[in-house]
């Protein structure tokens, strides 16, 4: 593996990982990408759980989603990058806001946040989330993505299905005027999701944060001004 150093122009040299005999080429590409990603390095420096934290930071800077005292749900929260940012910005745990993270996987504790393990689609788990919030949610976040299959059309359909389920949950817990943010992949199958969001929210916009990798098809739908669940 090449060492990171400084050239004559003080520009950092790229780190390059060689192809180990037992390592798949895709794994080597992932390692090279991680080692040369400035958001990965900055997340490590700041103590964020993942580089995804910067995506929420950038979305918040653009859309002003997080405010002190808010009640926030983070669906699919593990490892906790978005939950960290939300808890810090709403003042969770300081007798003000409340942030509840839920995931099928366990996540290490985050100061000020309540982390639950389970499936938000399960009625009993949904009730646990409501109880932990202590009232209607102001914001529901979803950075969820199903494991990639390598087939773009399949991955698109799977993430749209997750976003639709997250929307259904949000419609059940949001207060009037609340907001919903979810990751989707571009691909054309999100028409029904967007139609439902436009009925339920005053504003529906798309954004791709700078922290999203350029080659990724991911984008985020930002819906604000919740008016109530769309009519069947």
Protein language model features and the residues they cover:
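Class I SAM-dependent methyltransferase Rossmann-like catalytic core
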Residues: 2-68
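Glycine-rich helix-loop-beta junction characteristic of Rossmann-like nucleotide cofactor-binding loops
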Residues: 61-67, 133-134, 172-173
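Conserved class I S-adenosyl-L-methionine
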Residues: 68-78
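Conserved SAM-binding loop of SAM-dependent methyltransferases across substrates and taxa
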Residues: 79-93
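Short glycine-dipeptide loop
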Residues: 93-96, 174-179
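S-adenosyl-L-methionine
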Residues: 96, 102-149
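A short glycine-rich, Lys/Arg-flanked "PGG" loop and its adjoining helix->strand segment in the class I
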Residues: 160-176
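Class I S-adenosyl-L-methionine
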Residues: 186-232
